[in-house]
Amino acid sequence: MNPLIFKEDRPLDLIAVGRLCVDLNANETQRPMEETKTFTKYVGGSPANIAIGASRLGLQTGFIGKVSDDQMGRFITGYLKDNKINTDQIHIDCTGAVTGLAFTEIKSPEDCSILMYRDNVADLNLDPTEVSEDYIKQSKALLISGTALAKSPSREAVFLALEYAHKHDVVVFFDVDYRPYTWQSEAETAVYYNLAAEKSDVIIGTREEFDMMEKLLNYEQSNDQVTAERWFSHYAKIVVIKHGGDGSIAYTRDGQSHRGGIFKTKVLKTFGAGDSYASAFIYGLMQGLEIPQAMRLGGASASIVISKHSCSDAMPTRAEISAFMETAEELV
């Protein structure tokens, strides 16, 4: 059963808020970054990737964020517009802040890493005064991403967006998106992630991300069931815990659980899997699919993206996912 109820009389399906950055993916693979000579530029950032994926699948999508007042900022905004994402609430930073950069290293399909430049980034300068209540109430759903909670004023902007969402019955998706390099300590991270999760209808994260959120609780032993049940005492209706190549498990407040598998593919790199999974899973739920069907879409989308060089450019259409699912071997 799909427990989510969306307000159907709204012009936007999904609004994402948070990180907008640039990915520079290594063109030379099977080697360390020290030996990489060229990179290809893509729009990046977890909420940006999810918004792009959702738009490719047919959802009417918008974004609340902030970009640098330079060529990189204009590149990001232009790319989102080209992908039919409403950019009315993407603000331009006037303080001299820059666009975050993510350099990727692809030594092998199993050995990929990211080198991040996140000092003085524009996306974390999003101010609460730049979060429009009128804009949020036009949407059926809001996606927040954990990285936007790392610093003020972005942190307060996200919590204000959450308040507006609850006021206007906007379904909230929380993609945990834990990036240690943006935080001062695990304790600080856990506090703000827990506060955001308490106000979310759907929480999506890896087992490791949920472990981080539980560090302050001093659990002697935790498991997926215990983790999920903790959130059902708050707003959560669905908790998805991802286990990489072992698939994912979705828990619902009525006590049910659903296991999602993966689709066999030729893996080029591992990053981008979570964002593509989230975009297709959210799309499926918003189309009224049952949770197992939405999870299959997510798994197929993830397998497509990890077989390609980019994350944002590789986000598939609904037709591409359907064609892939017809031929690829599903591993449950």
UniProtKB/Swiss-Prot annotation:
EC class: transferase
EC number from the UniProt entry: 2.7.1.92
UniProt KW keywords: ATP-binding, Kinase, Nucleotide-binding, Transferase
InterPro entries listed in its UniProt record: Carboh/pur_kinase_PfkB_CS, DKG_kinase_firmi, Myo_inos_IolC, Myo_inos_IolC-like_sf, PfkB_Carbo_kinase, PfkB_dom, Ribokinase-like
GO biological process, one term: inositol catabolic process
Signal peptide location: none
Role description: Catalyzes the phosphorylation of 5-dehydro-2-deoxy-D-gluconate (2-deoxy-5-keto-D-gluconate or DKG) to 6-phospho-5-dehydro-2-deoxy-D-gluconate (DKGP).
HAMAP family in the cross-refs: IolC
Protein name per its UniProtKB record: 5-dehydro-2-deoxygluconokinase
Organism whose genome encodes this protein: Bacillus thuringiensis (strain Al Hakam)
